[in-house]
């Protein structure tokens, strides 16, 4: 082989090596982006105050809270800049996790809030969702949703793709629609959730929906999806307890019937049916219900 041929071969080998090295770096960089150190995280702030839930965010407690502002569009264009400013606030006390939301809207008259009955939701409404994974295992957890009208919904993740919407939680929330958007205040009692008191890190995620634009805005997401597997982290939860693990919820149903085509048309039959729901947690990861 002559000298020119030798130089050409060396150059070819060098070029092949550089291309191969570059290709190898692509998955390595992708893996680096997916490492736990890159997962968003917030540290919990503890307070002795208990907010009065009116949806106004005007109490000093919210000035102590951690503020979450680094949101992106989840749908339709994942990771694009959201169309509206979105803020969530997180703080906790001895008995509950408190979450506030401040949603700026440049067209507040366009806020979609149709349903007025608890438990019912309509496609295309504005709203928010909070996902909690108390065991931080990326497989289980809870979802709490709320509309501008204060309509609440909750579900239990059987796995990352299956939610049991029949699960009923004990929690409270209030909302206010105003001339710059809408705000919300949420209180989730720790006795509602199953968790290990020794675990101070939970999975957490936030979503805002702008109904008229069919836009979902989120904190963490992957492939336009939000679930326990792709949530952020809430750290520093210390000194919290589940209590006795027994919750009692009393209720009643009143019905009134009247037969119009009978001799006793003026007589009505009123029935009162009391009810009692018992929720018991024999272990941190198991809840039993009895009605």
Q: What role is predicted for each listed range?
A:
Residues 30-291:
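Structural preference for beta-rich elements and adjacent junctions enriched in aromatics
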Residues 13-27:
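Bacterial N-terminal signal peptides
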Residues 11-14, 101:
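In a subset of proteins, long, contiguous C-terminal domains/tails are tracked
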Residues 1-12:
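N-terminal secretory signal peptides that target proteins for export/translocation
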């Amino acid at each position: 082989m002559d000298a020119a041929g030798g130089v050409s071969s060396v150059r070819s080998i060098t070029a092949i090596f550089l291309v191969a090295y570059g290709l190898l770096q692509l998955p390595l960089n992708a893996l680096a982006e997916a490492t736990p150190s890159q997962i968003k995280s917030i540290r919990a702030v503890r307070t002795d105050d208990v907010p009065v839930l009116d949806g106004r965010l005007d109490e000093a407690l919210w000035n102590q809270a951690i503020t979450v502002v680094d949101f992106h569009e989840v749908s339709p264009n994942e990771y694009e800049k959201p169309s509206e400013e979105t803020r969530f606030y997180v703080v906790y006390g001895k008995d509950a996790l408190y979450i506030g939301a401040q949603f700026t809207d440049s067209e507040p008259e366009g806020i979609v809030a149709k349903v007025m009955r608890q438990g019912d939701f309509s496609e295309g409404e504005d709203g928010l969702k909070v996902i909690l994974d108390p065991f931080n295992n990326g497989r289980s957890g809870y979802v709490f949703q709320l509309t501008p009208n204060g309509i609440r919904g909750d579900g239990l993740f059987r796995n990352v793709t299956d939610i049991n919407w029949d699960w009923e939680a004990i929690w409270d929330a209030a909302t206010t629609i105003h001339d710059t958007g809408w705000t919300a205040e949420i209180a989730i009692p720790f006795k509602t959730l199953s968790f290990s008191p020794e675990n101070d890190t939970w999975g957490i995620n936030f979503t805002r929906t702008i109904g008229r634009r069919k836009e979902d805005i989120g904190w963490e997401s992957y492939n336009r999806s939000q679930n326990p597997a792709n949530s952020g982290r809430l750290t520093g939860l210390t000194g919290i307890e589940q209590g006795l693990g027994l919750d009692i919820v009393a209720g009643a149903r009143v019905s009134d019937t009247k037969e119009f085509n009978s001799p006793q048309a003026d007589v009505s039959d009123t029935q009162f049916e009391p009810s009692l729901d018992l929720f018991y947690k024999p272990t941190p990861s198991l809840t039993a219900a009895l009605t």
